[in-house]
Design a protein with these regions (language model features):
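Short secondary-structure boundary elements
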Residues: 4-232, 236-244
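Internal alpha-solenoid helical repeat scaffolds
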Residues: 244-263
């Protein structure tokens, strides 16, 4: 059904004026594509979860749009939307693959920084996915509407492609995050490199670069007294070192091993 018909249905279901339900109906339309079965399913789900509630004092249904935007979809609705991914343009599918590398959600600031680093129209493509109901854009984040949608996007890549994606995004983000002093994005960049692993390195000179980035990340974690995370960064840094690292990068190697031992 179209947006007008859906709004009429929602208004009648909640016994409210269509004017009062229009914003809610827009959210429902994005999440269900107007499928009547899923509209009813979603309204029931939100009512059961307390996101749609009957106010006895006001004598009408009420809801919190921000909480509804962040709520995950029921499994059957998510499966329906997952099948729609293949019908999207290649640019939008590519943007979903990129976002899926960062997990269930990513900050808009990170995505904008990655867009500048890669020189593409990532934000525009992700906004199309939001309009299609595959993503939610709220609380300064892009979030997959359901884990299955994130998994389907991630599974569009084979293992080697995933490693290359993780590595390239980490290498692209790290210098931008350093220049802008964004520690959160910097740590995310290093995490991407570690997800890729040493096997993703194609230029031998990058081994020491990534090891040094892990050294910096480990030091930041130690400053926050997160010694478990710090050890993980130092250990990952060591794994990126090449066989002759004691000869070629003695100071870097010594610092990584010493700090790992302290954790």
């Amino acid at each position: 059904m179209d947006e007008h018909t859906l709004n009429t249905m929602v208004a009648e279901t909640l016994c409210l004026s269509p004017r009062l339900t229009r914003a809610l109906s827009n959210i429902i339309y994005r999440k269900t594509k107007g499928n009547p079965l899923f509209v009813s399913r979603l309204i029931r789900s939100w009512s059961n979860d307390g996101l749609l509630r009957l106010s006895m004092s006001r004598g009408r249904w009420e809801w919190d749009e921000e909480k509804i935007l962040c709520q995950k979809l029921p499994d059957d609705v998510a499966e329906f939307l997952t099948r729609s991914i293949e019908k999207l343009s290649e640019d939008v599918k590519s943007s979903l693959r990129i976002l899926s590398c960062f997990g269930a959600a990513s900050s808009i600031a990170l995505i904008e920084m990655l867009e500048r680093a890669l020189g593409n129209n990532l934000v525009d493509s992700l906004d199309v996915a939001v309009a299609e109901g595959l993503l939610d854009k709220a609380d300064d984040q892009y979030r997959f509407s359901h884990d299955r949608i994130q998994e389907a996007s991630y599974n569009m890549m084979d293992f080697l492609d995933r490693c290359n994606y993780h590595f390239n995004y980490g290498m692209a983000l790290a210098p931008w995050a350093s220049r802008e002093g964004d520690d959160g994005v910097f740590l995310t960049a290093v995490n991407q490199l570690n997800l890729a692993g040493p096997e993703a390195v194609q230029d031998k000179s990058q081994n020491a670069v990534v090891a040094n980035l892990n050294l910096r990340a480990g030091k930041k974690a130690m400053e926050m007294s997160d010694f478990e995370a710090a050890y993980s960064y130092f250990d990952n840094g060591i794994s990126f070192l090449r066989k002759k690292h004691w000869k070629e990068h003695y100071t870097l190697s010594l610092e990584l091993f010493n700090l790992a031992a302290k954790c």
